[in-house]
Amino acid sequence: MFSFGNFFKKKQIEILSPVDGEAINITDVDDEVFNEKMLGDGVALIPAANEFYAPFAGTITSIFPTNHAYGIQHRTKVECLLHIGLDTVNLKGRGFEPKVKQGQKVKANELLAVVNWSEIAGEIKSNQSPLIFLPDSLKGKKITNIKLGAVKAGEVIAIIQ
């Protein structure tokens, strides 16, 4: 049966945790580029695992040459940046194993990368991993229902509407 409630329901995007761990406020990240939202708003994760997954279905728009950051665009053009760890760019790719390629379509919760935390632990500022949404891609949409605290990969941690 057709439901008018669903027809008129505003489209929203469920954002899944990309990793097991703890979700924290973006303003609590130990880097002013992220905590002052210079690149955009979002949430950060303190990983308790080494596997990172896609927070929603979309297309991989960028993989930094150092394999520590991934851009993903949803079909609605909302785009996020998953930045794994802080100051990880200095590792020049060491400790990061990408599982996707630029231009590849991914499903929600599909494996993006594996990180060898034990190999890089003493060489990074923090393993805090911001998941930010590029302001130009939101176009009037906002991030809501942010879940902080313990999270599992694949669990809904925010809604964009």
Predicted feature descriptions by range:
Residues 1-161:
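Contiguous, well-folded functional domains in the mature portion of proteins
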